[in-house]
A protein has these predicted regions:
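Short boundary motifs at domain starts and secondary-structure transition points
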Residues: 130-131, 154
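Extended, Lys/Arg-enriched charged tracts that mediate electrostatic binding to polyanionic substrates
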Residues: 132-142, 146
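Helix-start/capping segments and mature chain N-termini
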Residues: 1-119, 123, 151-275
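Intrinsically disordered, low-complexity linker/loop segments enriched in Gly/Pro
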Residues: 126, 146-148
Length: 275
């Protein structure tokens, strides 16, 4: 998919870069961020002009609905650099479409393609030096949207902020991942928001994952909420199981996130290509 470009976008450049202060060989996932971020507000029923500005904290009303009712969604993807210094993304259109599906489920406005994809393209152009070549080096991309409208009435917000921040990264896991099967806690339920990449889906996993970590496991493979006998997905990924020469994976439904890697692999698993 060709990335769209924005006809209008305000760019405020950082006074200086902190890139030379970063040890790219010893990164903790998600703790270091690039010099700039994309910000675009939704108010009065319309998306405003997006801005790329220096990465920094921002002010928000204490009564904003994101704090009280969890109206927040996000995506996660990575940029890679090849030996010719070209920057690549893996099917970002899928993340864009999934982001808007999550927005719809959470009663949030969909983000236009030119703001999401065009803004991402421009941000990556500015921050291309943060994408390092070599095996294991990536630039993690975190698009997200939060409800910024003030007031504690239990209703959808009328104002939102869409942002994209970037973080240089290496492997999320440094070695093999030890998992435990969920027998009590559930990630999602029928009729819930399991298929949305909503912030609350992840915070709800923190406590059972903490218990699993204390037992020496890095991740939980979640099971259905009714019987805990049907394997669904892990906390950070979809999963496949190989039994002899057959691969098994749960069908996507309203409880399971429709993973981009999973979706991309399925055609080749169902219809193998001779090599």
């Amino acid at each position: 998919m060709e990335l769209k470009t924005l006809s209008e976008i305000e760019i405020i450049s950082a006074a200086s870069s902190k890139i030379n202060e970063v040890d790219f060989e010893n990164l903790t996932f998600g703790n270091v961020f690039t010099d700039h971020m994309l910000v675009c507000d939704y108010k009065d029923g319309a998306w405003q002009k997006p801005v790329i500005e220096p990465y920094a904290p921002f002010m928000i009303d204490p009564s904003s609905k994101v704090f009280h009712y969890g109206q927040a969604i996000f995506e996660g993807m990575k940029a890679y650099k090849d030996e010719q210094d070209a920057v690549w993304l893996f099917r970002p259109d899928e993340n864009f479409h999934r982001f808007n599906k999550s927005a719809s489920r959470m009663a949030m406005p969909e983000v236009p393609e030119d703001i999401f994809m065009g803004g991402l393209h421009k941000l990556l152009e500015i921050e291309k030096d943060w994408v390092k070549k070599g095996k294991g080096n990536t630039l993690y991309i975190r698009p997200f949207m939060i409800a910024t409208g003030h007031g504690v009435i239990a209703a959808p917000s009328s104002e939102y902020r869409f942002m994209i921040i970037l973080s240089p990264a290496r492997a999320y896991y440094s070695g093999e991942v030890k998992v435990i099967i969920a027998e009590h806690f559930s990630r999602a339920a029928n009729g819930g928001i399991g298929a949305a990449k909503a912030a609350g889906n992840y915070s709800a996993q923190f406590y059972p994952t903490k218990l699993a970590n204390e037992k020496g496991f890095q991740q939980i493979i979640w099971t259905d909420d009714a019987t805990h006998t049907k394997l669904e997905e892990a906390g950070t990924m979809n999963v496949f199981f190989r039994i002899n020469d057959t691969l098994f994976t749960a069908q996507t439904n309203k409880r399971i996130l429709d993973g981009v890697t999973r979706k991309s692999a399925e055609p080749y698993i169902l219809h193998p290509i001779a090599v």
